[in-house]
Amino acid sequence: MTNSIRIGTRKSPLALIHTNLVIQQIKQFFPDINCEIVPIITSGDLIQNKPLYDIGGKALFLKEIEQALLDKKIDLAVHSLKDVPGRMPEPLVIAAVLEREDPRDVFVCLKYKSIEELPQNAVIGSSAVRRKAFIQKIRPDLKVTVFRGNVDSRIKKLMTGEVDATILAYTGLKRLEVFNPEYCHLIEYSQMLPCIGQGVIAVEIRKDDNAMLEICNQINHLPTFELIKPERAFLEYLDANCRTPIAAYSQYLDANPRHLSKLAYREVLEGNTEALATAAYKSNRTDASTGLTYKLPLEVEFGKVSNIQTNFMLGNLDGSKITFHTETTNIKTSTEAGIKAAKMMLEAICK
């Protein structure tokens, strides 16, 4: 086992918060490992005056970090999963994720509480074509203007009156401790599906680095890792970029397995309900030999915990045509469900 880890990350305040959350998880399992943060300035950070779709897409937030990983200048990289393209460099892999935060978007406005309440021809600041497509679906009269920068700079632009409103991810607002209910209003999934992977912190490593793989196996939040598979499969099949309005959100239908131990959850994946029942029982008791108290009992119908429902959205390049689709699947076939949805929706958009 290694004694030190070099962790590559963007230099933004939110990226550093994400990195420290990963370090906290690593320290829980490997308290003696030294974690060195290696801040890296990316092309996406440097170019702030143009929409991402004009300069290469969200991959610009990863390019320099992934190159450092490939050059073995860092051992692992921390990303917001929403910034990770569906197709990655072959030697690299997302080997772990942290538990998903609430992935909803937030309507940020000083005077009004929803998109519907905005006055005629109001201006919303947003560079995301996904958000633009949903905004125009709700209120075709609204003007959507390019609005880039970190969370603080966008809120400052709003405060100075550059726009009437903006839309930001709840995750960022919460983690930066700037969510203010006086002017921040959550948007429900039924009105605006989140970006694929929104709310998830991802850890990327080299596939052949066994030491990092061992660490990732320990810190990986399995329920979230399985939950994002249909979303990521949808994204990968379409090879979508920042010019394509695309969204997806997955959730467990029958029960939330977030409190199951890793042992119990692995039995879900294997489909061994008898072993699952035993593992779940053990994970919810106090171990007499160690004195450790595990998670509180969770009422679960064993075998149903693996049912996932994913809502998908896909639009054409100008956002004038949008299609929606829902897939309900088992964990074992969730990736195939994402691909199936992509094929069906692509055909519908192209008609």
Curated annotation (Swiss-Prot):
GO terms of biological process kind? protoporphyrinogen IX biosynthetic process
Q: Where does the source fall among the domains of life?
A: Bacteria
Q: In which pathway does it act?
A: Porphyrin-containing compound metabolism; protoporphyrin-IX biosynthesis; coproporphyrinogen-III from 5-aminolevulinate: step 2/4
Q: What is its EC number?
A: 2.5.1.61
For this protein, the record's InterPro entries field holds: HemC, Porphobilin_deaminase_cofac_BS, Porphobilin_deaminase_N, Porphobilinogen_deaminase_C, Porphobilinogen_deaminase_C_sf, RPE1
Q: Does the keyword Transmembrane helix apply?
A: no
Where is the RPE1 insert domain positioned along the sequence? 257-306
Q: How does it assemble?
A: Monomer.
Check the record and name the NCBIfam families matching this protein: hemC, RPE1
Descriptive protein name: Porphobilinogen deaminase
Gene name, Swiss-Prot/TrEMBL: hemC
